[in-house]
Regions:
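A conserved loop-to-beta-strand element in the N-lobe of protein kinase catalytic cores
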Residues: 61-71, 79-80
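A short, aromatic-enriched beta-strand patch in the conserved N-lobe beta-sheet
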Residues: 56-58
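Conserved N-lobe beta3->alphaC-helix segment of eukaryotic protein kinase catalytic domains
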Residues: 17, 22-47
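Activation segment signature within eukaryotic-like protein kinase domains
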Residues: 100-101
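Conserved catalytic-loop aspartate of Hanks-type protein kinases
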Residues: 175
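Conserved N-lobe ATP-binding subsite of Hanks-type protein kinase domains
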Residues: 4
Length: 194
C-alpha cells in the first residue's frame, strides 16, 4: 500500500481532528499517481453530508509525498462494524441498517448527479462519523463519466456487478449493485456472494 492515514489536529483548531492521508508517490507508476490526483479532484468538487469532506492537499518531502487533509470519521468503517457484530454473533438493528443504507444511497446519488462512478463501493470504503452517519470515501479509482460507458475492470470482487465481472461496458448501475451487496452484508454479516 502506498498510503497511511493519520489523525491530526491543526494548532489553530484546538479539539478539531482531521484525517490526513500520506501517499508515497515516489514509488508510484503514472496510473497510480493519476488515481491519487483524481481523488483530490473529485473530493474537492463535492460537498455532501454523506461523502467524506475534503479540506486541503499538498506535497512534502521534496515532492515525494502527497498529503490529503479530509474530514475525520473516527469510528472506523462498515467493514470493522460488520466484523464486530459477527464476532458477537449479533445482528444489527434494522433501523440502523436502513439508516446506513439510505445515507449511502444519498451520497451515491450526489456522486451520480455529478456524473461520477465510484467503482469501489465496499464496506471498507464507507466510513463511520462520530454522529453515527456513514460517509462514502476512498474515491481514488472513481471516474467522471464523459458520455461513453466505462470499460476498466476495477473494484473489489465481492461487490462487483455482473457487467464488470464479464468485462462489459458499465456505468452508474455498477455502484448501485455494490450498495445492494452492502445492504445484504449489513443484514447477513457476510457478503452475498462467497
Amino acid at each position: 500500500a502506498f498510503s497511511q492515514v493519520y489523525k491530526v489536529e491543526r494548532r489553530g483548531d484546538r479539539g478539531v481532528h482531521y484525517a490526513c492521508k500520506r501517499i508515497d508517490i515516489s514509488k508510484m507508476q503514472k496510473a497510480e499517481l493519476a488515481d491519487a490526483v483524481n481523488e483530490i479532484r473529485i473530493l474537492s468538487s463535492i460537498k455532501h453530508p454523506y461523502i467524506v469532506g475534503f479540506y486541503d492537499a499538498f506535497l512534502a518531502r521534496r515532492d515525494r509525498e502527497l498529503w490529503i487533509v479530509m474530514e475525520m470519521c473516527g469510528c472506523g468503517d462498515l467493514a470493522s462494524k460488520v466484523e464486530r457484530y459477527r464476532k458477537k454473533r449479533k445482528y444489527m438493528d434494522e433501523r440502523v441498517v436502513w439508516s446506513h443504507f439510505i445515507q449511502m444511497c444519498e451520497g451515491l446519488q450526489c456522486l451520480h448527479e455529478q456524473k461520477i462512478v465510484h467503482r469501489d463501493i465496499k464496506a471498507a470504503n464507507i466510513f463511520l462519523a462520530a454522529d453515527g452517519s456513514v460517509k462514502i470515501g476512498d474515491l481514488n479509482v472513481s471516474k467522471r463519466m464523459k458520455g461513453a460507458l466505462l470499460r476498466t475492470q476495477i473494484g473489489t470482487p465481492y461487490y462487483m456487478s455482473p457487467e464488470v465481472w464479464l468485462n462489459k461496458p458499465y456505468s452508474f448501475g455498477a455502484d448501485v449493485w455494490a450498495v445492494g451487496c452492502l445492504a445484504y452484508e449489513l443484514c447477513a454479516l457476510r457478503p452475498p456472494f462467497v
